[in-house]
């Protein structure tokens, strides 16, 4: 039976952040089952950063090269910090069966309009830690198969 390819997109699993630790725990568990072909898309590091070679699964950074970010406006720079363009490259290259995005809701702006969004199984795991719940989260929920 062919293994399902699962792309997990969040902070780098070795980053000292809540998202990083959460992602590390999830990746370790799934890796140890031996059932999945895992792809880590890591916010905060570049596509082929040296750190991508330090984990036992395939890992790519979601951060473009600094020269690509310099000409962008602040909003575009923030979006690229969350991998807005490189997520498309990862989807194209690795052809995952499942995309799991784990991040604050503003990291996923425009994702539901991406051509691949409804072509694969998508899941967003986001923090809902404010009251009232941010309108972005309420608007995005019906656009995600697994929220």
Please place each PLM-identified region on the residue numbering.
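Extended catalytic core of nucleotide-activated donor transferases of GT-like folds
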Residues: 50-146
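N-terminal subdomain of nucleotide-sugar transferases
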Residues: 1-49, 53, 94
């Amino acid at each position: 039976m062919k293994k399902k390819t699962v792309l997990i997109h969040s902070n780098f699993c070795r980053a000292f952040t809540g998202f990083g630790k959460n992602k590390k725990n999830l990746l370790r568990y799934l890796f140890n089952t031996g059932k999945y072909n895992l792809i880590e898309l890591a916010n905060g590091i570049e596509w082929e950063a040296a750190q991508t070679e330090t984990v036992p699964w395939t890992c790519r950074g979601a951060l473009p090269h600094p020269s690509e970010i310099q000409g962008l406006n602040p909003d575009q720079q923030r979006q690229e910090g969350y991998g807005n363009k490189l997520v498309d490259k990862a989807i194209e290259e690795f052809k995952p069966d499942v995309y799991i995005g784990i991040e604050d809701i503003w990291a996923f702006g425009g994702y539901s309009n991406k051509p691949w969004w409804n072509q694969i199984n998508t899941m967003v795991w986001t923090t809902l830690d404010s009251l009232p719940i941010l309108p972005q989260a309420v608007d995005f929920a019906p656009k995600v198969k697994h929220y």
